[in-house]
Swiss-Prot record:
Subunit description: The 26S proteasome consists of a 20S proteasome core and two 19S regulatory subunits. The 20S proteasome core is composed of 28 subunits that are arranged in four stacked rings, resulting in a barrel-shaped structure. The two end rings are each formed by seven alpha subunits, and the two central rings are each formed by seven beta subunits. The catalytic chamber with the active sites is on the inside of the barrel.
InterPro entries: Ntn_hydrolases_N, Proteasome_alpha, Proteasome_alpha-type, Proteasome_asu_N, Proteasome_sua/b
One cellular component term from this protein's GO annotations in UniProt: nucleus
Organism ancestry: Eukaryota, Amoebozoa, Evosea, Eumycetozoa, Dictyostelia
Record family assignment: Belongs to the peptidase T1A family.
Coiled coil stretches, renumbered: none
Protein name (database record): Proteasome subunit alpha type-7
Organism: Dictyostelium discoideum (Social amoeba)
Gene Ontology BP annotations: proteasomal protein catabolic process; proteasome-mediated ubiquitin-dependent protein catabolic process
Primary localization: cytoplasm
Keyword hit for Cytoplasm: yes
Subcellular location: Cytoplasm; Nucleus
Function summary: The proteasome is a multicatalytic proteinase complex which is characterized by its ability to cleave peptides with Arg, Phe, Tyr, Leu, and Glu adjacent to the leaving group at neutral or slightly basic pH. The proteasome has an ATP-dependent proteolytic activity.
Keyword Lipid biosynthesis: no
Gene name of this polypeptide: psmA7
Amino acid sequence: MSSARYDRAITVFSPDGHLFQVEYAMEAVRKGTVAVGVRGKDVIVLGVEKKATAKLQDARSIRKIVKLDDHICLTFAGLTADSRVLISKALMECQSYRLTVEDSPSVEYISKFIAGIQQRYTQSGGVRPFGISTLIVGFDTDGTPNLYQTDPSGSYSSWKAAAIGRSSKSVGEFLEKNYTDVSEEESIKLAVRALLEIVESGNKNIEIAVIRNKQPIVLLDEQEIDKLVAVVEAEKEIQKEQEKSEKQQK
């Protein structure tokens, strides 16, 4: 059997254990705009990179942060068209769960549901894997903050901070180096700092959502993001000066 057949067939493993179509879907994620999630003590922050819109395009029509339920929010990296299908299924499941159980679904339940759909599309004929990864965030009924990540293979896992999309490895390393279980203000600043590692400065390129327990999801406006970017840039300059001063003293 030629290698080309493994390349085309979604349900056939290559001799060395690869499902190439799943790996190609993951590559589509790596080419998508970056998204980060940070879980604080009593807050969760989602930050996403926004693509520049055409001059005549309405920027308000392009949203990468989506509300699934009163307490659950999702963002993604990868193919936007694929995300619409998954988001639609997740919204329907949230509504169905409320009608059936008469309670809101947990963040883990919805994460597992989305991952289950992604997994089924890796072993079914006539379909292809979803070319997106998702970050799903929200609070459980006991007030516990949750951040889950899913990928095209159908796996899902819980994180304190995570990054998906382009340069997610370097952004993830930055989060790993700088993350602490911190206050709301520091969590928001960490998400902005992580995005600014690879995103050009400016409110037009960044979207931030703040999720608090039993409160409406808040999308920061351009003025608030501008202030945050200015504060983060100023802190980076101070840090550079301190490092420069320390080197000179040595």
